[in-house]
Regions:
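N-terminal small-residue-enriched
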Residues: 1-445
Length: 445
């Protein structure tokens, strides 16, 4: 690979490409899914590809390959030149010059990579068995999944930059259905971790069973205004679907109402929103972004005040600011976009139970669905199917389902009254505690 990249760079220079970058990614992944104690899906893949981009006659061109021979060199160079000639975007930023120290981060866990496929299958089967045997009302277990992967990224460019990292990750997820007379309840739970021990059978299986059983005998509440608390994981889903409004790329396309509001108050004083790619154990952690820019922590919203958009080199150049190092490619062949890393709401000091006792009565939303159809990131409006439970004097009362909770995310940020201390990152890079958002409209019976 070293010789191939060197040959590619030399060929690009000889062809008149002014500057260029090779982005190499490799992925060694495993996935197994079980249903009712049987393995129904099994995948083990090793893939490697190279994305190549270069500035030719003032325009950026793109090409990619999964072949690494002499013929591929010529195809990549020609592909970049042809792509650049068709490009109408004149706002491309120059490639990163490679300056600045790269944080020393160890994202490897060789022990995870050495776990055998059978050991992984045994783990997901053990989790499923635990759920099934936890209560006679558990009727079915399905879509129980274990994933593991080892991923390597290497970026080399014509400015002399050559940096790489490798990470090991895994995830364990379970789902179940319970029956009690005419009542049926389904729920799921999962964890992501950088170690095999982090894929805890008792934790995942116990939570799947508890959440599924907690939903039995659920019913809608009467329609009206309710004091609403989003449970941490439901709040993560909500923040995740609206995270793009904090992207400079989105704002520059006129698709974020935060455009032009840096320095203004956009949220309640208790709201602080951070993007931290240096977080130990974070699923979004990385030493540099997908343009090679060293990672750094940024406070996006501080005590309710909007401090910065998230940027890559292109958006930063357009706004006349420094990049925040949040460039991301969804694959080696994709264009560069802006994406948060470990993006989270800073937690408060009180536990969820203490916060609920302080509120008195209301509705806790534990799950939301229909996020893509029911949420509009441009306007901020949302209307989502939800599950949860009512509470009084801080104590859980009745399970709730088949309701719709509606509001506006921009208004919700300003309406936040308190954040609990239970910060969690459910399965990825979005983290939230449980949040008291004041009153929202709920449609039920």
């Amino acid at each position: 690979m070293q010789d191939f990249v060197k040959q590619l760079m030399e060929a690009a220079k000889a062809a008149g490409i002014e500057e260029c970058e090779a982005y190499v990614s490799s992925r060694d992944s495993f996935r197994a899914m079980t249903t009712e104690g049987e393995v129904v899906e099994y995948e083990s893949n090793l893939t490697r590809g190279l994305g190549f981009r270069g500035l030719y006659r003032g325009r950026m061109g793109y090409a990619s390959t999964e072949a690494f021979d002499e013929e591929a060199v010529g195809q990549l160079v020609r592909g970049v030149m042809e792509s650049a000639e068709l490009c109408e975007d004149e706002d491309e930023a120059p490639l990163y010059d490679g300056g600045g120290p790269v944080p020393d981060m160890d994202l490897r866990n060789p022990a995870l990579a050495q776990v055998t496929p059978q050991e992984k299958i045994d783990r997901v089967l053990a989790m499923e068995k635990l759920v099934k045997e936890s209560d006679p009302r558990i009727d079915k277990t399905a879509h129980n999944v274990i994933n593991t992967g080892s991923y390597t990224v290497r970026i080399v460019n014509s400015h002399g930059m050559d940096r790489s990292y490798t990470e090991d990750v895994g995830a364990l997820y379970g789902q179940a259905t319970a029956k009690d007379g005419d009542f049926v309840s389904s729920s799921g739970y999962g964890v992501a971790a950088r170690s095999f021990d982090g894929l805890d059978v008792k934790k995942v299986g116990g939570e799947v069973a508890r959440r599924t059983l907690d939903g039995l005998n659920a019913a809608p509440v009467p329609s009206g205004k309710y004091r609403v608390v989003f449970f941490s994981e439901a709040m993560c889903d909500l923040l995740g679907v609206f995270s793009s409004i904090f992207s400079a790329e989105t704002a520059q396309k006129g698709m974020s109402l935060l455009k032009g509001r840096v320095g203004e108050r956009i949220a309640a004083p208790c709201v602080t929103l951070v993007d931290d790619p240096l977080m130990e154990g974070g699923m979004g952690s990385r030493p540099f972004d997908d343009e090679g820019v060293p990672s750094a922590t940024h406070t996006v919203v501080e005590d309710g005040v909007f401090r910065t958009f998230l940027h890559n080199l292109k958006t930063a150049r357009k706004d006349g600011v420094a990049t925040t190092g949040k460039a991301r490619k969804v694959g080696y062949a994709s264009a560069v976009h802006v994406t948060p890393t470990n993006f989270y709401l800073k937690p408060g000091k009180r536990t969820l139970d203490d916060m609920l006792r302080g509120i008195g009565e209301g509705l806790v939303i534990t799950e939301v669905s229909g996020l893509h159809a029911g949420a509009n990131p441009i306007s901020g409006d949302f209307s989502l199917l939800a599950k949860g439970y009512t509470f009084r004097e801080g104590r859980r009362e009745k399970p709730v389902e088949q309701i719709t909770v509606a509001g506006n995310f921009y208004e919700l940020l300003s309406a936040v009254r308190e954040l609990a201390s239970d910060l969690t990152f459910p399965m990825g890079g979005i983290g939230c505690p449980s949040v008291d958002v004041g009153e929202l409209s709920v449609s039920g019976t």
